[in-house]
C-alpha cells in the first residue's frame, strides 16, 4: 500500500477513534510531572521538552533556532525517492534522521547549506537524552512550531530506527527549481499533489533565509515571521519592487518590502495556474491554514516510516498561543493596497483586506543561530 493511502487510513482510524472517545474509557499513563499521556513511553519526552525549550529555544521563542528546526524537518523528511528504489538504487529513508547522522555528507548538499548550524546545536540533546535523531528532529520541529502563535496543535509520533546510510543528493527542492520540478519531487516523495505542496510551504510563514544572499542573513519571508499566520500568502502575491540585499542571487526575485526576501520558487508557485487558487485560499483563512498544515506536517514526518508501528506522543507537544488580538489574520502591510496584488487565481477575487496604518513597512532581520 502506498504511503499516502496508508496515512489516509491511519488518519481515518484516528478520527473514528476520537469520535467514539466519549463511549470508550481511555487508558492513560501518569508521568512523574503529573501530566498524563496515552502511552507511558512518552513520559521521557517531557524531559526533552523542558531541556530544549530552555536551552535551544531560549524559553520557548519562535526565533532563529525554531525556524531552522522547522526547516530541518522538511529537509530530512523529503529526502526519499520511491522512483529511485524502483530503479534498484537507494532512494533515501525519509524522516529517519540521516541528515544528522551523516551530517558531514548531507549538510554539504547545496539545498542543505546552513543546516549544519542547527544540526550542531541539536546533536547534544540527542546524545544527552538517548533518543534517535529522526525522532528528535520531528519532535524539535513540532515544539518549535508550538512556540509560534497561531500554529496548529502539532502531532508527534516516535518509533523511527536510525538511518544506516545517507540520503542521496538531489532530493531536496531548490529555490531556483521550476514548479514542474518541485511538484514532481514531492509527488515522488509521498504522492503529494500540487495542493499539498502549497500546504507544505505554509512553513515559510515562520521562516527566514541565511544563505540565498551571502551579504545579509536572517531575512524573513513575510512581515510577521514570529507568527504562524497567512501573511506569507498575502505578501508573496504583492508586486516585487527591490532586493533586500545585493540582488542577482540564484533563486531570488524582487520582494515587496524592505528587509523581506522572496525566493523564486515561492514566487512562481504563487502564480502558477495549478497552485495559485490554493495559495490565495489561505489569505484571511486561519482555520484552513491550521488544519492543512497540521495534516501535512504529520505526513512529512512519517515519510519512509510505518505509521502502524509508531507511538503517538502528541500529548507532549505544547499548544501554541493565539495570534495577538491587535492583528487581523491577514492584512496589507503599511503602504500596500489591492493595487499592489499580482493576482493569479482566475476563479475567485482576492479577499478584501485592510491596510495597516503608518509609514511603509520595513521588515526586521532575525539574528541567525550562533555560529551561522
UniProtKB/Swiss-Prot annotation:
Activity vs pH: Optimum pH is 2.3.
Root EC class: oxidoreductase
Record-listed Ca(2+) 2 binding positions: 205, 222, 224, 227, 229
Origin superkingdom: Eukaryota
Residues under site feature: Transition state stabilizer: 71
Gene3D superfamilies documented for this protein: 1.10.520.10, Peroxidase, domain 2
Feature: compositional bias, Low complexity: 350-361
Binding site for heme b: 204
Location of region: Disordered: 350-372
Annotated glycan sites: 285
Keyword Heme on entry: yes
Record text on cofactor binding: Binds 1 heme b (iron(II)-protoporphyrin IX) group per subunit.
Listed PANTHER family: CATALASE-PEROXIDASE, THYLAKOID LUMENAL 29 KDA PROTEIN, CHLOROPLASTIC-RELATED
Protein's name according to its UniProt entry: Ligninase B
Organism expressing this protein natively: Phanerodontia chrysosporium (White-rot fungus)
